[in-house]
Amino acid sequence: MSKSIFIVYGHYNTKESFNASIRDAFIEEAKKNGHEIDLINLHDEKPISFYDGSEPDEQILDYRKRLEKSDVLFMISPCYNLRATAILENWIDKTLAPKFFFSFKRIVGNWGYPIAGAMKGRRAIMSMSYGGNWFSIQTWFQNIPFRRIKAGVLKLGGMKTTYIRFYEVLPGMTKEKFAKHMERVRKLVKRI
């Protein structure tokens, strides 16, 4: 069944990076499988202001409208200092915000629970690439982005989350290893 996929790309190199290869392989395979793509390369967009308590502007409202039309949200970022890129984190803060993405049901005082909003029950995919190996990343660094984004943001919005992680993504990666990573991306698309 054809899906509408909203891709948010958060790497500064939109042409020749490993993350650009992930994006391009995903889009190519998705189109082969009949899916529709709505792509935002954040570094090619008008810069998003940082959250200051004001109401969302037209740019954020447009992102939300496009997101509401989608079946799948796919975010792509390298890991910088144990976080997604600042530009993607800012997009998350502004776009996947209350009361659009979730609201809060107060029970007593400040105690309560989140209520999923516009994207409830839809699928989210988070792609993260790391320069380090899987053992050091998963053993020593417990505040890694995929856990915080999944357990915090995406869970609040009621989304079903899938992760695809790439370790030891460094210049000089062998062609064989690169090809295996791209095959994982193609397999991911086939499971949508």
Predicted features and spans:
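N-terminal beta1-alpha1 ligand-phosphate binding loop
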Residues: 2-35, 167
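A short, flexible beta-alpha/helix-coil linker loop
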Residues: 11-13, 45, 130-135, 168-172
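Helix-loop-strand module that forms the ligand-binding subsite of alpha/beta enzymes
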Residues: 56-148
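N-terminal beta-loop-helix "entrance" segment that forms/cooperates
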Residues: 39-58
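Glycine-rich, highly charged phosphate/nucleotide-binding loops
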Residues: 52-69, 181-184, 188-191
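Short hydrophobic segments within beta-strands
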Residues: 8-10, 40, 127-129
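Glycine-rich phosphate/pyrophosphate-binding loop and the adjoining helix
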Residues: 136-192
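A generic structural motif
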Residues: 33-38, 159-161
